[in-house]
């Protein structure tokens, strides 16, 4: 992955209907599967709360699946500014709006 330095190695990932939080490895697996089965993603920031040291945003994802229908979902991303060295993603919550 090209931007590993933006992800905290101890980050947590919450997938749809998961029984417990997953780790960075499972996030990479989900992201690779998502990229392989979807195309033309349009990602917009729906809501942002934060300052120069920490922040949380809701990303709205609208994409085509391989079967050519649009899929839309929201996901929450929480990040922390690592002592001025840059932003690190600490938590990705994909469970928003899941059935």
Swiss-Prot record:
InterPro entries, A to Z: DUF5390
Top-level taxon in the UniProt lineage: Eukaryota
Pfam families recorded: DUF5390
Protein name per Swiss-Prot or TrEMBL: Uncharacterized protein F22B7.3
Record organism: Caenorhabditis elegans
């Amino acid at each position: 992955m090209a931007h590993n330095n933006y992800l905290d190695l101890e980050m947590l990932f919450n997938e749809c209907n998961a029984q417990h939080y997953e780790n960075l490895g499972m996030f990479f697996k989900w992201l690779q599967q998502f990229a392989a089965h979807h195309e033309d993603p349009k990602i917009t920031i729906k809501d942002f709360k934060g300052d120069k040291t920490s922040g949380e945003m809701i990303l709205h994802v609208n994409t085509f699946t391989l079967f050519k229908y649009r899929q839309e979902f929201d996901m929450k991303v929480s990040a922390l500014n690592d002592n001025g060295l840059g932003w690190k993603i600490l938590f990705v919550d994909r469970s928003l709006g899941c059935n």
